Amino acid sequence: MDLQTEIGKTLKQARRAKALSQAALAKLAGVPQSHISKIENTGVDLRLSSLTELARALDLELMLVPRKVVPAARSLIRQAQPTPISLTKPALRDD
């Protein structure tokens, strides 16, 4: 997966985790909703200023990490995130 596609996927996951529509995120970040759609679906090449505003709106931090520590950083991020709830399967109930 190329970097633009990975960024789009990550932003989409973060937006959904915050229960924001594309329109709501666009308003928070000060960019058009159509731009959010393109970023999420086509991996558009973002300007740093747009990426910074989107990260701020989603309460994310942009960071440059040395390549040799990327696997460790990804592992820490996975451990810190709650297990995602499937949007396609109904939740199990205890009643």
PLM features per residue range, with description:
Residues 9-24, 53, 84, 89:
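Short basic helix-loop element that most often maps to the first helix and adjoining turn
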Residues 19-35:
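Short alpha-helical DNA-recognition segment
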Residues 65-95:
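Short, charged recognition helix plus adjacent turn
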Residues 9, 34-37:
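Positions in alpha-helical segments
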Residues 1-6:
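A detector for short, charged/polar N-terminal pre-domain segments
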Residues 49-65:
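DNA major-groove recognition helix of helix-turn-helix/homeodomain DNA-binding modules
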